[in-house]
């Protein structure tokens, strides 16, 4: 029964991501951007994933230069970006999640699992999954949705690897 519940949850997540991605590609999802408090949507996303974070022993570390950090974004899209990045860290990371922020930038970083490194050139491509990631589920849409939402809000997203950590940086329009 637990296996069936998990598979149904995975299928629901896949359908939700496909629907969102299709709406984004078709221009059917208007985003109303403005000066948005960066932390409240992050707290909501972290609370949503609290059981998974706790089970993974991945208590997030937050490093923001101030609590009232604001970015140019749609609050709903920003929340979705956060949720996708947290889900990605849980699914593909080796523990430890750090989120840092300063004027116009927010960076998520997490430890990598042992094995082959993700291909940074294709990390944000639709349906991209590194070889080991295929065994951990997902459709390969989460990070492409992050890129699409960031670009629709006038921002950018980039990724890199430093030592044994993957970092994903969100740069918001000023």
Where are these regions (language model features)?
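Short alpha-helical segment of the dimerization/phosphotransfer core of two-component systems
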Residues: 6-11
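Conserved micro-motifs of the catalytic ATP-binding
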Residues: 26-31, 70-73
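Conserved catalytic submotifs in the C-terminal HATPase_c
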Residues: 32-35, 59-69
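Short helix-loop "hinge" at the ATP-lid/N-box region of the Bergerat-fold HATPase_c
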Residues: 89-90
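Short beta-strand/loop element within the Bergerat-fold HATPase_c
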Residues: 96-105
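Short conserved segment of the HATPase_c
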Residues: 115-128
């Amino acid at each position: 029964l637990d296996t069936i519940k998990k598979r149904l949850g995975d299928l629901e997540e896949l359908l939700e991501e496909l629907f969102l991605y299709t709406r984004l590609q078709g221009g059917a999802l208007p985003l109303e951007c403005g000066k948005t408090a960066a932390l409240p949507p992050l707290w909501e996303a972290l609370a949503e994933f609290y059981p998974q974070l706790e089970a993974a022993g991945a208590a997030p570390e937050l490093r923001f230069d101030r609590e009232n950090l604001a970015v140019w974004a749609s609050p709903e899209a920003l929340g979705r970006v956060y949720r996708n990045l947290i889900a990605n860290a849980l699914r593909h990371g080796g523990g430890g999640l750090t989120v840092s922020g300063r004027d116009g930038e927010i960076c998520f970083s997490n430890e990598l699992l042992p094995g082959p490194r993700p291909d940074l050139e294709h990390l944000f491509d639709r349906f991209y999954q590194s070889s080991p990631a295929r065994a951990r589920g997902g459709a390969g849409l989460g990070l492409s949705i992050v890129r699409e939402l960031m670009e629709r809000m006038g921002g950018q997203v980039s990724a890199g690897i430093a030592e044994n950590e993957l970092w994903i940086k969100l740069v918001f329009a000023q």
